[in-house]
Amino acid sequence: MHFSIPETESRSGDSGGSAYVAYNIHVNGVLHCRVRYSQLLGLHEQLRKEYGANVVPAFPPKKLFSLTPAEVEQRREQLEKYMQAVRQDPLLGSSETFNSFLRRAQQETQQVPTEEVSLEVLLSNGQKVLVTVLTSDQTEDVLEAVAAKLDLPDDLIGYFSLFLVREKEDGAFSFVRKLQEFELPYVSVTSLRSQEYKIVLRKSYWDSAYDDDVMENRVGLNLLYAQTVSDIEHGWILVTKEQHRQLKSLQEKVSKKEFLRLAQTLRHYGYLRFDACVADFPEKDCPVVVSAGNSELSLQLRLPGQQLREGSFRVTRMRCWRVTSSVPLPSGGTSSPSRGRGEVRLELAFEYLMSKDRLQWVTITSPQAIMMSICLQSMVDELMVKKSGGSIRKMLRRRVGGTLRRSDSQQAVKSPPLLESPDASRESMVKLSSKLSAVSLRGIGSPSTDASASAVHGNFAFEGIGDEDL
């Protein structure tokens, strides 16, 4: 998650109280909550009390007198760095103290009272699941409610996640982010005030070997099957005409497990596909479509002859990556503390081991750069868990009072319609040269922008390779 405080507001206190400065905390470029300095100071003091002064980052000091505009801007920058540092710390960023603070602040900012509501969650095939939740229910609460409605066993809930998406005209989903433990799904989706935004249930792991655990259960099997059919229909999974014929035959026989076994062998099975964007690979300002999955980022591009090509970047060959956000400065290049902020430009840049002795930066410019970074991190995390012999089955936080709420009337996962004929343009896919020798090293960033870069993400799954491995 990318935390930022891009702006401040001067607001009046309740009942005509004295004015104060509010700091707008954004997550992935969208307003999450609006807080006062005193609220963040209270959070800081609570974290220090629980974890010690040596663990918690430094906090901007109090001031005896009212702040000048320049001092407000300085404090904004310091608070932004503080929030980023806390979130990136594995201990502090996952703490209930930090996450509950953000949930309360989100609810207060949007002025949503705590009450029981109906929330619509979509499956990958567009099927609607209506669950009854509280407006103050956090992400895991809602996930458990959806699982209960579908009768998905408790031990399989950890294989799925809720995603905030924007539904496009063709019915496909543009992924905004995976809903996190610090937010309230009902508030997150309704605060966007657009019917385009939905919450979708989708599997949350990358390694198809984990499919075996999910497929043992009828509901889990149906969820994987519905997601796979949807991904094929939208062109996320690449199929030839012959493969499509085989899949349709298995679908007609309602052979769901065999259907999934065949789908697992197809290119881009289980990948997340992002909207079209721009990369500097294999040349500057190259239009590409990025997909994430199977421990790699895939870049598809169309050459002048309309031939599709693909370049694959394995996460084990990425030494590190970073997300950079920048905002064009007003004409004249000067920055005002209270200036309005333009549209944020996001870049994902990763340092890639092209050959044994050659590391090179590759940059992708996309509004979904943060989501791509999250995908990279989760793939690395999954690789490390598997390498250590661990399991992705997670222990679920239990509600006060014990067991999950189970609905009296479970909802079945509907079987999707038969596959339509494939798009012939999806068949011609040529791998780029594995040496990638045509790409030259270039830096990132621009002197004409006001940039705020998040910390570089080191990759613990990075492996050195030799030329014979390329």
Swiss-Prot record:
Record carries keyword Transport: yes
Positions of modified residues (Phosphoserine): 336, 407, 409, 415, 421, 437, 440
Positions of the PX domain: 1-109
Subcellular location: Cytoplasm; Early endosome; Cytoplasmic vesicle membrane
InterPro entries (UniProt xref): PH-like_dom_sf, PX_dom, PX_dom_sf, RA_dom, SNX17-31_FERM_F1, SNX17-31_FERM_F2, SNX17/31_FERM, SNX17_FERM-like_dom
Tissue specificity remark: Detected in brain neurons (at protein level). Broadly expressed, with highest levels in brain and placenta, and lowest levels in colon, intestine and liver.
Topological relation to the membrane, as annotated: Peripheral membrane protein
Annotated Pfam families: PX, SNX17-27-31_F1_FERM, SNX17-31_F2_FERM, SNX17_FERM_C
Major site of localization recorded for this protein: cytoplasm
Region (FERM-like), start-end ranges: 115-432
GO cellular component: cytoplasm; cytoplasmic vesicle; cytosol; early endosome; endosome; endosome membrane; Golgi apparatus; protein-containing complex
UniProt keyword list: Cytoplasm, Cytoplasmic vesicle, Endosome, Lipid-binding, Membrane, Phosphoprotein, Protein transport, Transport
GO-annotated biological processes: aorta development; cardiac septum development; coronary vasculature development; endocytic recycling; kidney development; protein transport; receptor-mediated endocytosis; signal transduction
GO molecular function annotations of the record: low-density lipoprotein particle receptor binding; phosphatidylinositol binding
SMART domains, sorted: PX (SM00312)
Region spans: PTB-like F3 module: 270-432
Similarity field: Belongs to the sorting nexin family.
Subunit structure: Monomer. Interacts with APP (via cytoplasmic YXNPXY motif). Interacts with KIF1B. Interacts with the C-termini of P-selectin, PTC, LDLR, VLDLR, LRP1 and LRP8. Interacts with KRIT1 (via N-terminus). Interacts with HRAS. Interacts with ITGB1 and ITGB5 (via NPxY motif). Interacts with CCDC22 and CCDC93; the interaction associates SNX17 with the CCC complex. Interacts (via C-terminus) with VPS26C and VPS35L; the interactions are direct and associate SNX17 with the retriever complex.
Function as written in the Swiss-Prot or TrEMBL entry: Critical regulator of endosomal recycling of numerous surface proteins, including integrins, signaling receptor and channels. Binds to NPxY sequences in the cytoplasmic tails of target cargos. Associates with retriever and CCC complexes to prevent lysosomal degradation and promote cell surface recycling of numerous cargos such as integrins ITGB1, ITGB5 and their associated alpha subunits. Also required for maintenance of normal cell surface levels of APP and LRP1. Interacts with membranes containing phosphatidylinositol 3-phosphate (PtdIns(3P)).
Name under which the protein is recorded: Sorting nexin-17
Lineage: Eukaryota, Metazoa, Chordata, Craniata, Vertebrata
Gene (UniProt): Snx17
